[in-house]
Amino acid sequence: MTDAAQNVIVLKDAYDRWAESKGDSADHWTAIFADKIKFGSLAQGSYGAAYLTAYQTRDQLAQYFAGLKRDWEMLEYVAEHYVAQGDRVVMLGHCSWRNRSTRKVVATPKADSWRFADGRAIEFYEYYDTAQLRDAAV
């Protein structure tokens, strides 16, 4: 099996667990992150979601997952397609979340870009509708 195919298998399992737990558990994510990771989110800390920003280590990512869990209720997370080439994988899907304070819902297409080395994720960047995020957070 190629590294690209193995990386897709790892991600499919992680996305399945994420959806099944409704965002309640991040252990499956932290298990695949390298100690040092270049991690980014399109919102870059805007819209009252300071945790949707850049991180450099797996330990720092606890802030990201704690913020999501505190502020948002996952309604749906569907990873539909995976495109893999070499050390990179892109996941295309959609998700919806309800803001716990405003009760407003974000339903957005989702694209995640991953890069792997030695079986661990060393880069991640997520893309989603930041206008909906802004509108739901206020």
Q: Residue ranges of each PLM-predicted region?
A:
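Hydrophobic aliphatic residue packing
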Residues: 10-11, 45, 61, 89-91, ...
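A solvent-exposed, acidic/Ser-Thr-rich amphipathic alpha-helical stretch
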Residues: 31-87
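A beta-strand edge to alpha-helix "cap/lid" segment located at domain peripheries
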Residues: 1-5, 66-138
